[in-house]
C-alpha cells in the first residue's frame, strides 16, 4: 500500500514538474522572441540598463526550466542528489522571495522615492543617441496607460523645453501635438498610473502569488518525501 502511494507521489511530482518545465520553456521562448523582435524596447531605468522586459522573462524562464528539469529527473530516476538539489533551489527561491517582500514593505517609501528619481533621470536620455529603447518604452507606456511623465506631464519640460511633451502624452495623438500648448494632455503621471493598476488588481496578484507559494511548498514536500523514502530503503522501488 505504502509503495503504491509513493509510486503515485513519484509520478505526480514528475507530472507537476513536467508542466513546470514546459512553462519555463514557454517563458524562455517568449523572452527570446521579445529580445529579437522588440530589440529596441528596453528599460526605463538608466541605473539598470539590462533590466528590460525581455531579459526579465528570459531569466525567469531559465530559472523555472532548470528547476522543473531537476524535479522531473530527480523524481523519475529516484535520484537523491537531484531531489535534494531541487529542494534546495526551491527553498532558496522561497527565502529570496520572502526577504525581498519584507524589504519592499519595510522600505516602501524609500523605494518609491528612489524609483521616481531614477525614472526622472531616465527621461533626460529620451532624445540621446543609443537610447532608442528607452524612448520606445516611454512612448508605449504613455499611450497604453494614458499618462504623461513620471509624476506628471511637467517632468518633460526640463527635457524637451517649456510647454513641450512627447506626442504620446496627447489625448488625441497627432504629429507635433506635444508642442501645442492648447492640446489636451494626459495629466496623471505614469508612476501613479502603475500604482493604481497594481491596487486595482491586488486581489488577482495576491491569488497568483498564493498559488505560486503553494506550488513551491508542495514541490518541496514531495521532493523531501521521496528523498526520505529512498534514503531509508537504500534502493529504488519498482514503478
From Swiss-Prot:
Gene3D superfamilies, A to Z: Tetraspanin (1.10.1450.10)
Pfam family of the protein (one): Tetraspanin
Membrane topology, Cytoplasmic segments: 1-13, 77-85, 225-239
CDD domains (alphabetical): NET-5_like_LEL
Parts of the chain on the Extracellular side: 35-55, 107-203
Transmembrane region(s): 14-34, 56-76, 86-106, 204-224
PANTHER family named in the record: TETRASPANIN, TETRASPANIN-9
Protein's UniProt name: Tetraspanin-9
